[in-house]
């Protein structure tokens, strides 16, 4: 009985030992795998899970169709509509087949997953069975664990004993070597002090180098902007930025502690500096971030450089403007000399202008030959003096009219040289054309002066005949009464003559300005002929209707009243109409109207006949005594500018001057109010357009 109890106790002890040693339990993975399969079975047993699965299949299939464009929507919609109209059952069957295919595929995937999990479970169970057969009894395991623990404790003790021996030896060495270590520590401290100093010097050198590099890059950018400037300014720009680094070195020596404190923000300051100078591109990364003094100082230096550049630019612009002004003055002097010389040869003449000048000279020579004999007999020095003065005044008008064309230097520095060359060429071309205009005007003036001299000679011959008759006849008291209204008429006519002379000079200035501004455009060869015809138009104004000068003397005293009324009407006429008439004649007069000069000879013959037929009354004698020759000339010009000239018919194109032309013209001339900035020649009237074409 005792043996049985012992065996029973032994068996009980073995079971306890087995439990304490934990004979290898099955892995938790197996339990999880079993639970997953159980969960799948439980979930799919409910119908809600199946509904969710179907919904997911539909949604993700739709996503796949949209993402990968698996369906042609147009064909699909058209075919589906046709199929629904024809065979709705076929559509339903096709849809069912497609859905069943999807469902079968999904179930096949699930079955594969589940079957693979079942295979893994079987393999794990087989491995556990094999391990259970090989396992050792638990008593042997206990012994093995105890032996391993003892082996681990022994090497730890050995390591501790070795460490204690080493510590003792180190303690002895410390006691012996305390004094020499102190000296070594002093040396090490000195070396450490020297090393940070060298480091600081190296840092300062790096800072200086980086600053110099940034300055050089800034200089290069400046040079790219200053390529078109003159060399001295570039030299100044090179000298100026070299000064700041010395001051910066001093600041670096004075402020080393500040750098050490603010090294945290060095990289930020470096990036800001690089973006300010424009060196760093978005793809690059800074290799050496040098700490600058403060973020404000480089910006200040750049602003100072920009201010210096602006000052230098201003100086250079002033120099350029002064040089261009000097050149323009020299060109003006040359052009004036050419106009004074007048008849010198000029290379820029086109052949047609030469032909027209030759025609003018031949016409003038023919007129001179016909009328030299009459004019030589009747010339007097008193008549020649005021005419010379008139010539000088007209030449003075010509010269300032030529000067106003100036080429102002443009603000952009890039185009200065090109503009200067263009200005020289344009001024040379303009000077040649101005000289041509000056020559033509002088020739026209000489023709006018000869006609005036002839008229004055005729009047002087009439005066001589009258003086001979005066000596024979006596003076009467009634003549004195008639003198007074005539003298008043003459006094009134003097300011009118002056006003008309001023108006004529201003009109000529306007026409010359227009002629000067036009050479910039491309001028066809036909236009110089028109210009000469226009200049011929001036004498035709003054030569029209010279008859009233000779007929005015023998008239009854009523003629004096008529003259007074005419002068009053003239004074009331606004100056704008006179300007318009002169302007219209010069611009819009056609070459068909010009040959009025050819009628001068018969007009002069009529003057002679009128002077012979006129009765020699006492009034005429007294007038010829008291009135000087210059007043007679003024009366002639008054008669020429009488309102009879204004009553002549005006062509349609001279009448219409509208700002916005609407296709209908007025019977009377309408002048737009000219603004001071506008050129009077640039009116958009249809008449001018047709004439220019």
From Swiss-Prot:
Residues 117-130 have a biased composition (Acidic residues). It is a single-pass type II membrane protein. The chain crosses the membrane at residues 48-68. GO terms for molecular function: signaling receptor binding. Signal peptide: none annotated. Residues 1-47 are cytoplasmic. Residues 117-260, 278-649, 666-693 are annotated as: Disordered. Keywords: Disulfide bond, Glycoprotein, Membrane, Phosphoprotein, Sarcoplasmic reticulum, Transmembrane, Transmembrane helix. Residues 69-693 are lumenal. GO terms for cellular component: cytosol; membrane; nucleoplasm; plasma membrane; sarcoplasmic reticulum membrane. Detected in heart (at protein level). Detected in heart. The keyword Transmembrane applies. Residues 354-364, 672-693 have a biased composition (Polar residues). It comes from the Eukaryota. Phosphorylated by CaMK2. It is found in: Sarcoplasmic reticulum membrane. Homooligomer of variable subunit number; disulfide-linked. Interacts with CASQ1 and RYR1 in skeletal muscle. Interacts with CASQ2. PANTHER family: TRIADIN (PTHR14106:SF0). This is Triadin. It comes from Mus musculus (Mouse).
